[in-house]
Amino acid sequence: MDRRLFLQFPLLASVLALQAKNQSKTNSSKGFVVRSGKDRYQEELYIMGGEFDCKVSSKDTDGALLIYDTVRETKGGPALHFHESQDELFYIIKGEFIVRVGDDAFNLKAGDFAFAPRKIPHAFAKTSDSEGQMLVMFQPAGLMEDFFKQMSQLGKNIPKDMEHALKDLFSTHGMQVVGPPLKY
């Protein structure tokens, strides 16, 4: 047997064993239910006129998926942005929204779904006068759960230079703002 191969085998076996362990690791050993209007961890997150309830945490899926249910009273939404590493998905429960993905804008109502691939600029805005509600999903979750928690805190403790603070927060979490919020 080749001596180099013999010496490399234990190292390779260790790396493969660690990788297999990480792929099979699951933080949720059983299913769970999160009731309507409730957050998975009883946290209260309010961001830009919307309440965000975590339904599936990145901790539940080893970072594979994150789902928020957002109820929005006010019109509008976030600035045009993209994620380096996450796809973002939108499922409308009630109300009307406009969702832009790349150069295309879609008017969405209850039951409609939109997919925004990673690295493609996108944004949404609630356009209806009545309350709006949608599921916002990220795959993989990446740093998005932490982003939402920090955004909520930023709204409670507004810095003097909000534009700079937002740019830094987006950048730290793998996103880039590339335009203003949608006009509707």
Annotated model-derived regions:
Residues 2-24:
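N-terminal export signals
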Residues 18-49, 153:
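C-terminal segment of N-terminal export signals and the immediately downstream linker at the start
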Residues 44-80:
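A short glycine-rich, His/Asp/Glu-containing loop-to-beta-strand
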Residues 71, 85-99:
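Short, conserved beta-strand element in jelly-roll/cupin
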Residues 79-85, 123:
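Histidine-centered catalytic micro-motifs
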Residues 104-118:
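Short acidic-glycine-tyrosine-enriched beta hairpin
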Residues 118-145:
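Ligand-binding loop in jelly-roll beta-barrel domains
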